[in-house]
C-alpha cells in the first residue's frame, strides 16, 4: 500500500484476490472525505489467474496516478511480469490505463516486483528482481519516462547489480530526480 503526499488518498494491492481468476490480484484506491475512506472508482483486476497483480503499488503525490505491479504476468513469457499505469478521472469516478503494459524483458524476470512513481507521476521505476542482464537472477531496475499516449514508452535508464545480488526499487523516490535502489547486500542512490 502507499499513501499520497497529502495523506488523503491511498492505493492498496491484494495480490491473491480471485476477481478475474485464482490469484489474479487486484488494487483499490481510496480517498478520505473528512470522516471516512471512500473507494475511488472500481476494483482494478489482474489480467489472468496467477498474475499476482497488486503485489506492489505506488501513487503519485497528487493521488491522481497509480502504478500496479503483477510480477507473475505471462504477457512477455512465463512470469515475465508487468506494470500498468492508471489515471483517475473524477468526472467519471473511474481509472483508465495510461499506456500499454510495461512488460518484463524475458520469461521469469518478475518485473513489477516493486514499483515506484515519482512525485509528479511522470516517471516510474520498475524492479525485475530475477532479470538475468548481468548475471543469473541478478535483477535490475528500469526507469521509464511516461509520455502522453500514444507515444511509446521506453526505459531511460537501467540500474543493474554487477555482483549477482538482486536489485529492488524500494519505493523511496524522494523527488523526480532521485531514486534509492536496494540490492541484496548493497544500497545505492542514483540521480537521473
Regions found by a protein language model. Name each.
Residues 185-191:
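Short proline/glycine-enriched turn/loop motifs at strand-loop junctions of beta-rich domains
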Residues 152-172:
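Short, solvent-exposed loop/edge segments of extracellular or virion-exposed proteins
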Residues 44, 102, 155, 159, ...:
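Extracellular/surface recognition and adhesion modules
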Amino acid at each position: 500500500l502507499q499513501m499520497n503526499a497529502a495523506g488523503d488518498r491511498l492505493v492498496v494491492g491484494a495480490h491473491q484476490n480471485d476477481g478475474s481468476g485464482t490469484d489474479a490480484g487486484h488494487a483499490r484506491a481510496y480517498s478520505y472525505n473528512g470522516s471516512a475512506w471512500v473507494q475511488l472508482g472500481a476494483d482494478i483486476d489482474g489480467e489472468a489467474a496467477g498474475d499476482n497483480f497488486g503485489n506492489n503499488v505506488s501513487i503519485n503525490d497528487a493521488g491522481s496516478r497509480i502504478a500496479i505491479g503483477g510480477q507473475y504476468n505471462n504477457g512477455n513469457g512465463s512470469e515475465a511480469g508487468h506494470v500498468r499505469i492508471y489515471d483517475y478521472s473524477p468526472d467519471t469516478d473511474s481509472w483508465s490505463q495510461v499506456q500499454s503494459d510495461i512488460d518484463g524483458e524475458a520469461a521469469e524476470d518478475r518485473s513489477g516486483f516493486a514499483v515506484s512513481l515519482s512525485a509528479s507521476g511522470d516517471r516510474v521505476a520498475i524492479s525485475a528482481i530475477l532479470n538475468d542482464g548481468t548475471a543469473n537472477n541478478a535483477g535490475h531496475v528500469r526507469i521509464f519516462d511516461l509520455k502522453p499516449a500514444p507515444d511509446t514508452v521506453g526505459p531511460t535508464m537501467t540500474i543493474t547489480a554487477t555482483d549477482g545480488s538482486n536489485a529492488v526499487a524500494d519505493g523511496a523516490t524522494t523527488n523526480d530526480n532521485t531514486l534509492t535502489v536496494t540490492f541484496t547486500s548493497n544500497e545505492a542512490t542514483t540521480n537521473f
